[in-house]
Structure formats: C-alpha cells, structure tokens
Amino acid sequence: MEDSYVLQLLKPKFKDFHLCFCGFAECKPLHSYGPAARPNYILHYVMKGKGIYQVGETKYPLKEGQAFLIEPESLTFYQADKTDPWSYLWVGFGGTEAQRFVRDLGLNSRQLTCECEYGEELKEIVFEMLRHTN
C-alpha cells in the first residue's frame, strides 16, 4: 500500500512534447507496482528511502537522489525496500520529441537510471502542479 497523489492530464496541447501526469507516493515496506507496461515515458525521482527497479531480468537498486526511467511499452516492476521504503515522485510524458528529451538527460534503453542533480527543483515543480488539482 502507498499514500499517493496524482495529477492526470487528459488532452495534450502539443504534439512534440507534453505532460501526461505527475504525482508522488510515500510507500509502505515492500510495496510494489507491476509487472506492467505503460504507453508513455515515466521518470521517477527517489526523494528518500530505497527500492529496486526491474526491467526484464535486470535489477537496479536505487536510493535517495537517484532517478529511473520507464520507457513506453516496457514491462517493468519496482518495489520499496523492506526496512527503508522509498518516497518518490513521477512525471509521465510523451510526444514526438520525448525520446530526444530522454537522450538529452543521458538516458536510453541501456542507461535507465541516473543521479539526479536537479531533484529538489523537480520536486518543487511537481508539488506546485499537484497544488492545482483541486
């Protein structure tokens, strides 16, 4: 189980790049999601705690300050740590230029995780968007 808050955007205004949704979750120990595939990119940023992200047979241990990318139609699984469960935020996006944006972040199918040097700024932006859900 998790406590989560989500902003869902139903109609994209731009074809080249658009936000689909964003949110954050504070997970309970061993809370998991998947295996599941999604139609768009989703970037997760770990705000605190630890967990694992799995794509196929590859597992990525993650901790505070790191990010992981879910690619469109990729079957993934992720799970909070038993003793130090994570809290994370996510941003789902798509569009004709989304793949270029992902590459500009230094991510691709072979590099799905990274240290996130602008994590606090990303957190502020997502939380500001979530304040406008009511």
Model-derived features: positions:
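Small/polar loops that bind or transfer phosphate-bearing groups
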Residues: I70, W90, C114
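Alpha-helix boundary/capping detector
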Residues: Y45, Q79, V91-G94, E117, ...
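Amphipathic alpha-helical segments enriched in hydrophobic/aromatic residues interleaved with Lys/Arg
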Residues: F101-N134
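Ligand-binding loop in jelly-roll beta-barrel domains
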Residues: K59, E73-E97
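Generic protein-terminus/edge-of-domain signal
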Residues: M1-A67, S74, K82, S109-L112
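Alpha-helix N-cap/helix-start motif at coil-to-helix transitions, marked by capping-box chemistry
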Residues: K13-D16, A37, G92, C116-K123
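Amphipathic, well-ordered alpha-helical segments in soluble domains
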Residues: H18, I42-Y45, G94-E97, E121-I125
